[in-house]
A protein has these predicted regions:
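Short secondary-structure capping/junction motifs at helix and strand boundaries
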Residues: 101-105
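Active-site recognition of the HExxH zinc-binding catalytic motif
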Residues: 66-78
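Short intrinsically disordered terminal tails
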Residues: 1-2, 107-111
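Active-site scaffold of zinc-dependent metalloenzymes
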Residues: 5-62, 78-100, 111
């Protein structure tokens, strides 16, 4: 099943839950900069006090979804004390499209 990136991006919620009583507010911003520590441009952030995921509003649909998944994984790593490295987060991010397909198959929405 091919992803409809535009539809997926449109469905990003304003608030997402990682545990039964843990939520992250999801915000959009155009104020992202080059990260001198990593040497990469920043497209999203995850904060833990308060719980907040911020996404770059100026990305394309597919890039936005990957950033959203990436930041959500950072939140999961924190909330479940997984201590994932950035490389591990990046690798898990790449798997989310397949996890989505797996769930759709279980729900009978994909054959």
């Amino acid at each position: 099943m091919k992803a409809n990136w535009k539809k997926l991006r449109k469905n990003i919620p304003n608030r997402v839950r990682t545990k039964s009583r843990t939520h992250y507010e999801v915000l959009w911003s155009d104020e992202f900069h080059f990260d001198e520590k990593t040497g990469k441009k920043t497209y999203g952030t995850t904060r833990f006090d308060p719980n907040l995921i911020t996404l770059n509003i100026n990305q394309g649909d597919k890039e936005t979804m990957h950033t959203y998944w990436h930041e959500f994984i950072h939140a999961l790593s924190e909330d479940y004390q997984l201590n994932l490295t950035e490389t591990q987060v990046e690798n898990l991010e790449l798997s989310f499209l397949y996890v989505r397909e797996f769930i759709l198959t279980l729900e009978g929405k994909k054959k």
